[in-house]
């Protein structure tokens, strides 16, 4: 499956050039943002870690081994890219124990930047946002057009697609999910089951969003829509009055799409019909999610880009800095600007 099939159309037109992303880890930097005041004491040791070329799960295993504790006592808020330079929090439960020597966990791929104590463990999804610094190298494109598009994106946001990495190489996770769904079975391994169910929900969401981008309604509330604020998981129905709420114009309030689960789409009118129609088109995946006991949730269709700035440190390098809510993908912003090409190759686009 190609990127257009997995995501959908761009909102702002064709790519304005080509570039390379992740030639080195420093080209893709992520800083986890937590809004948690630490107590300074308690049985949980919180660890601020910088890692490069290392996934979050492997970092957790290294911390557990160095601390001499079971892996289950190590927690983190979210998974971060392996092919990146990332800084994120971990917590280790150490009831009645002193701070362990964690130096054995460190090498050129993992550094412990600071530690503190807290009364609670780090929960999944506890981070409020992620800060990104991206360097698009070997950039070849129209800088004036890039600047104009970025100014527009800063004002209007972008479609909140799940990025292609959610679906595996060439959409392999979607293929696997469809295979399990056709057999009406679930993988026994918990991590595989979770990954494929998440893939299925993300794929259905992207299909709905793709249709809204195609008809120009992805950033416009319609009667029957379910609306949500940027950082809220709750939603409410849109009538005529809600469709002209000024908070829509300032990117505080957004229409939402389905993360499929039990029951019909809770939207109404034409929005309900669209969502039900797309789910019916993927009936095996829809029924598989329902039978797995997934509850219906919503995700905002429009992604506001916080603190967006950009400059060119070198003529062929475009550097972007911005903040996204947790669970959103930096690569969908890049996609609205340029086609990515493999390292060392700038004459043909790479679909991944």
UniProtKB/Swiss-Prot annotation:
Record field: catalytic activity: uridine(13) in tRNA = pseudouridine(13) in tRNA
Function summary: Responsible for synthesis of pseudouridine from uracil-13 in transfer RNAs.
Alphabetical GO biological process terms: tRNA pseudouridine synthesis
NCBIfam families the record matches: PRK00984.1-2
Residue ranges occupied by any TRUD domain in the UniProt entry: 157-303
CDD domains: PseudoU_synth_EcTruD (cd02575)
Catalytic site: 81 (nucleophile)
Pfam families the UniProt entry points to: TruD
EC number from the UniProt entry: 5.4.99.27
A molecular function GO annotation: RNA binding
Protein name as annotated: tRNA pseudouridine synthase D
Enzyme class: isomerase
Family note: Belongs to the pseudouridine synthase TruD family.
Keyword tRNA processing among record annotations: yes
Assigned keywords, A-Z: Isomerase, tRNA processing
Transmembrane helix found in the keyword field: no
Database matches in Gene3D superfamilies: TruD, catalytic domain (3.30.2350.20), TruD, insertion domain (3.30.2340.10)
């Amino acid at each position: 499956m190609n990127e257009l099939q997995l995501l959908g159309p761009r909102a702002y037109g064709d790519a304005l050039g080509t570039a390379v992303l992740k030639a080195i880890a420093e080209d893709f930097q992520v800083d986890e943002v937590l809004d948690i005041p630490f107590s300074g004491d308690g049985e949980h040791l919180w660890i601020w870690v910088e890692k490069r070329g290392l996934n979050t799960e492997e970092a957790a295993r290294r911390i557990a081994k160095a601390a001499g504790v079971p892996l289950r006592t190590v927690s983190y808020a979210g998974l971060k890219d392996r092919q990146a330079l990332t800084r994120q929090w971990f917590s280790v439960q150490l009831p009645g124990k002193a701070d362990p020597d964690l130096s054995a966990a460190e090498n050129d791929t993992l550094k412990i930047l600071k530690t503190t104590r807290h009364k609670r463990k780090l929960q999944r999804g506890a981070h409020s946002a992620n800060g990104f610094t991206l360097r698009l190298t070997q950039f070849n494109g129209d800088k004036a057009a890039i600047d104009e598009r970025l100014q527009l994106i800063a004002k209007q946001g972008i479609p909140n697609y799940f990025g292609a990495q959610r679906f595996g190489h060439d959409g392999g996770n979607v293929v696997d999910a469809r295979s399990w769904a056709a057999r009406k079975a679930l993988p026994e391994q918990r991590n595989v089951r979770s990954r494929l169910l998440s893939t299925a929900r993300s794929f259905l969401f992207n299909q709905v969003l793709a249709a809204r981008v195609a008809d120009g309604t992805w950033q416009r509330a319609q009667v029957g829509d379910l609306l949500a604020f940027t950082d809220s998981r709750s939603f409410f129905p849109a009538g005529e009055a809600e469709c002209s709420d000024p908070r829509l114009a300032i990117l505080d309030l957004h229409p939402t799409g389905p993360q499929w689960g039990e029951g019909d789409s809770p939207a109404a009118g034409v929005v309900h019909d669209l969502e039900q129609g797309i789910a019916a088109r993927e009936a095996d995946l829809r029924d598989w999610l329902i039978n797995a006991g997934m509850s219906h949730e919503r995700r905002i269709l429009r992604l506001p880009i916080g603190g967006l700035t950009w400059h060119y440190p070198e003529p062929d390098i475009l550097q972007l800095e911005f903040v996204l809510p947790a669970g959103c993908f930096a690569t969908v912003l890049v996609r609205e600007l340029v086609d990515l090409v493999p390292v060392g190759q700038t004459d043909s686009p790479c679909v991944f």
